[in-house]
Amino acid sequence: MNLLYLGLLLFVTLLTTLYLASSKAIFAFSDWTFHAARVEEIYLNLKSGSFFTFIAARTFHNTGAASFLFYPYIFFYPWAFLRFILSPVNAFYAWYALVTFATATISYFSMKAYSKKSLASFIFSLVYTFAPYRLYLGGAVFGEYLAVIFLPLLFLGIYEVLWGDKKKWYLLAISGALVAYAHILSVFLSLEFAVILFIIKLITSRGISKDRIKSLLLSAGVCVFLVLPVIVPFFTDFIGQGLSSAKPSISYTMGPRYLLLNSFSAQKGWKLSFMLMLTILTAWAFIKSRRNWIIYGLGLFACFLTTRYFPWKLTAGTPFEMVQLTARYLSYASLFLTILLALGSSSVLEEHVTGRKKLALSCSLAVFMALFSLSSLSVYRDTLKHVQDMPKTSANSTQPAPFKRLRDYNYYNQFNYKILFGAFDYMPKSSLTSVQKQNSLLMHQAYLNGKTLTLSPLIKANQISYQVKSEKAADVDLPVIAYKHTTVSVNGQKHAFRRGNRGTVVVGLKRGQNTVTVGYKASPVFYLSIVISILSWLALLIYLVKFKAKYAQ
């Protein structure tokens, strides 16, 4: 049955993707320009023969912003590689399909390992993968979108360590690493629920065995080794460097009425589906096991966290402010409530349906979910028909990227606009003290001998060069951000520099024409972390092969 269900999941994936791709357009909204610029930088660096991307030399207005150091991007490589063989729009939709099918597949097998029921796993995968909130994430919010792939596997790993087969600790290590590769904030959110589950374990089991504690610590330790390349840059380049990050504050909470009423609409967005709302309203009458009561409680609590009824004001000044948008908890609400929906509905259906009827039922469920998803995506599709194409603007524009339509012919127009969200993330705090400073970076303005110069950059992978003519020996303040491992050369010779009041590179020049090149050289510790991570993955793979062989005996 696995092949049948995977085939049906692939069918729904392709149908929904082709529905969007047939528009031959993308709606650039929310975080789209931030992530699209990162993918473009990776693609162009790959094209020039550089595998690693550290700073934004070609995008982000050539400011050298280091979002690549502090915001994971490994799962953007498939999108970047697709750019070599497909047009920009088609490359995105091909990547979108890959991510969707990966979500469906991992969801299916995670639920299968938990429930041992194929039909329940199929229903879970359909509802979870094509949930309205996840469809919303797939339009632009790609960090969360990628993290959602691995949440079912992550919570399967937590379950195995705390209640199930503790020898499967590796599931938690692997899934935790994959979530970290996708979205650091999702690690924090997942940790919140992991702590809750740990407390529930202590209460319901009146403690926890030493063996389970060992498995928990082992999974955490291995996970750290796997994610070292993500962690190390924070120690080598962020801590103590006066850099900014995403603003830690709760900027939006939903009202319960908004969540309830919108969840009964068929459109994608900050909502649950009507199926999950019905699960909330009816599941309590059918739940019999303590385990399912725990799952139900977690689903309700996740919904509660999305609303303003939770005292979010009390979290001011705490790490919980990193959440920013409480709608992020909808992914967790969808996960827990979909488990109950899948278990309950599959039990009822399997009592009354067998043989060929079961095959027909599975196909019907796939068609229903496909139609439901197409309905959820219809507003987005209609928007693509009526919104205007993104117009051209100057290469050093300070105008924020508008919510407009991108096609292949105007795809590159977006990169001349100021990135709407995240343009100044991970820059020195001194860069952000005034709009004038920010705009001077976007407009490529340098300061020399009391004058303002507008320069044109010469670009290579992780490298930005400027031609600067000085009438006398003087310091020039370039529109490129200075980091701990920034490198500077003047006329081909390595040169000392300092950080100016814009957080930028300030370097002394001799009289005459000078070529100043600003680059980035990663710490040796970073490359060591990659080696350790790769060796850890290989060691884990060898362990799994031996474990499976022993388990089979």
Predicted regions and their residues:
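Start-transfer (signal-anchor) and selected internal transmembrane alpha helices
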Residues: M1-L18, L540-Q553
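Hydrophobic alpha-helical membrane-interfacial segments at the cytosolic entry of transmembrane helices
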Residues: L8-L9, I208-V232, I294-F301, V367
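Active-site lumenal/periplasmic loops and adjacent helix-entry segments of GT-C-fold
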Residues: L15-Y114, L119-P152
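Membrane-interface transmembrane helices that cradle and orient dolichyl/undecaprenyl
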Residues: L154-K168
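Membrane-interface alpha helices of multi-pass inner-membrane proteins
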Residues: G157, W169-I184, S219-F225
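Perimembrane helix-loop-helix junctions
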Residues: S190-A220
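Hydrophobic, aromatic-rich transmembrane alpha-helices
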Residues: F225, L272-Y296, L300-F301
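Active-site-proximal, structured, solvent-exposed surfaces of multi-pass membrane proteins
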Residues: K429-Q553
